[in-house]
Every structure is written in structure tokens, then in C-alpha cells.
């Protein structure tokens, strides 16, 4: 199988890194040269990675085509490419839906939308796909955990939550900086904070079969530090603000 990536940003770099370090069987990966620095770095790093002369060469040469460009670029270039029937197109573009992709491609190809995140480089994290596709499911299960979505409208909810990645890192950064301001060395602060949140996340995964509200309750003791923390953040409308932000992102996606 030959895999082609149109667009060479952070997500392409993460996905390609994950693929090359996984047990996925493939002949080669062909990259566009849109971001030549990223493309060259991946080519130097992995022997099966090559750089294409142009996007059409990728479409001509590969069985699976991954679209990893911005919506603005996608709307401009996809309709200019000449796809072949029976190719598989996996789109990472958040604001171009299936109907728009089908119209732009104009050929009978299998189209799947996917939402990979940077931790895919270490073969961690969820990868929602829509519509369900067994081959694509098996592929991403080797890079993380595939989540199949039948209703495309529902997929926008997952796209919205993917917008919480930078806010999460900003939370880690804020708490880490708080420790640094109080005399803790930055390396120690970051090691403690990242280790703490990894442990909390893993605990949540283990207990994910029950409602997460019980973890909120179980992590508090009467008049304890965690009770104070969650009460004050609720009073400051922190979680309401979080939900409003998710609603705002979803509203943007639903306009497509």
C-alpha cells in the first residue's frame, strides 16, 4: 500500500511518525512539499518516506490519499486534482464536509473524515472517523483508538472537543508557571504537573465505564483542597466558560 499526504504541517508530521513507528505494512509514504522543512525532516528520519514533485504525483502514485491542508487551501486545490476510482481519501480538514469533498473530488472514491491529534505520533489517543470504514478503523487502531461515527452531524461535536488541546496545554502551562513563580525549578515543575495529569487521565480511562461525575466526587474530601478548588472554579464560572467555548466552536463548524 502506498500512502500520500497532501499538506505537511504538524498533523501530517505526527501521523507519518506514528505510521513509521508502528506495525502498519506499507510500501512508501509520499509527501507534498508545501512545508519543505517538515517534508525533508521526515524524509531524513524514515527510509520509506519520499517527497513528491507536486500534489498530482501523490494522487497518481498512491492508494490512500490523506488531505491535511487548511480549509482555505483545500477548497482551492482539491477540485484541481484528478483522482482515480476506488482510491481512498482520508480528510483531516475540519470545515469541509463529506458532501463538499465528494463534489470537489468528482470521482467515485471512498471518502472518510478523520480527527487525528498530535499524540498519534506516539500511537496514543482517539481517532474519530466518519463514516465507519473497516480498513480505516483497522489502520488507525494501530496508531491509537478508532472511534466510529455514523452521523456526520455528530462528528462536529468531536471536532469541537479536539479544540480543547491547546487550552489543556495552557492549563498545564499556567499551573507550572505558578510553581515556578514560587521558587520551584521549571524542570521540576513541569515534570510534576505533566506526571500528575497523566496519572489523573489514566485513572479516568480505567474508570471511564462509570459517569465521570463520580470521579469528581470521589477525589474530594469534606473541607479538603480539592473541594475548595472545584468550588472556587465553579463560582468563577470556569466550567461554564469552557462549555460556552465548546458551543462557540460547534457553532462555527455547523455553519459549513
Regions found by a protein language model. Name each.
Residues 12:
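Catalytic nucleophile loop
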Residues 19, 23:
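Aromatic pocket-lining residues of Rossmann-like dinucleotide-binding sites
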Residues 100-110, 125-158, 163-207, 248-256:
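Internal alpha-helical scaffold of NAD(P)-dependent oxidoreductase catalytic cores
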Residues 26-28, 86, 187:
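Short acidic capping loops at alpha-helix termini that bridge into adjacent secondary structure
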Residues 194, 198-256:
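NAD(P)-dependent Rossmann-like dehydrogenase/reductase catalytic/cofactor-binding core
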Residues 1-4:
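Extreme N-terminal starter segment of soluble prokaryotic enzymes
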Residues 8-9:
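Glycine-rich Rossmann-fold phosphate-binding loop(s) that bind the pyrophosphate
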Amino acid at each position: 500500500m502506498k500512502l500520500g499526504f497532501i499538506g505537511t504541517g504538524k498533523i501530517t508530521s505526527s501521523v507519518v511518525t506514528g505510521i513509521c513507528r508502528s506495525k502498519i505494512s506499507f510500501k512508501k509514504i509520499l509527501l507534498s512539499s508545501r512545508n519543505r522543512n517538515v517534508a525533508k525532516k521526515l524524509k531524513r528520519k524514515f527510509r520509506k518516506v519520499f517527497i513528491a514533485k507536486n500534489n498530482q504525483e501523490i494522487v497518481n502514485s498512491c492508494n490512500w490519499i490523506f488531505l491535511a491542508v487548511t480549509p482555505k487551501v483545500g477548497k482551492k486545490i482539491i477540485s484541481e486534482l484528478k483522482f482515480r476510482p476506488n482510491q481512498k481519501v482520508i480528510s483531516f480538514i475540519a470545515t469541509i464536509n463529506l458532501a463538499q469533498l465528494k463534489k470537489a473530488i468528482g470521482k467515485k472514491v471512498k471518502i472518510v473524515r478523520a480527527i487525528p491529534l498530535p499524540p498519534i505520533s506516539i500511537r496514543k489517543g482517539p481517532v474519530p472517523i466518519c463514516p465507519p470504514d473497516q480498513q480505516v478503523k483497522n489502520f488507525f487502531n494501530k496508531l491509537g483508538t478508532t472511534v466510529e461515527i455514523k452521523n456526520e452531524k455528530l462528528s462536529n461535536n468531536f471536532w469541537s472537543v479536539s479544540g480543547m488541546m491547546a487550552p489543556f496545554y495552557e492549563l498545564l502551562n499556567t499551573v507550572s508557571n505558578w510553581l515556578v513563580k514560587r521558587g520551584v525549578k521549571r524542570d521540576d515543575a513541569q515534570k510534576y504537573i505533566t506526571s500528575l495529569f497523566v496519572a489523573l487521565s489514566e485513572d479516568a480511562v480505567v474508570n471511564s465505564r462509570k459517569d465521570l461525575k463520580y470521579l469528581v466526587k470521589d477525589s474530594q474530601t469534606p473541607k479538603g483542597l480539592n473541594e475548595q478548588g472545584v468550588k472556587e472554579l465553579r463560582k468563577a464560572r470556569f466550567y461554564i466558560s469552557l462549555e460556552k467555548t465548546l458551543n462557540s466552536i460547534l457553532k462555527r463548524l455547523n455553519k459549513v
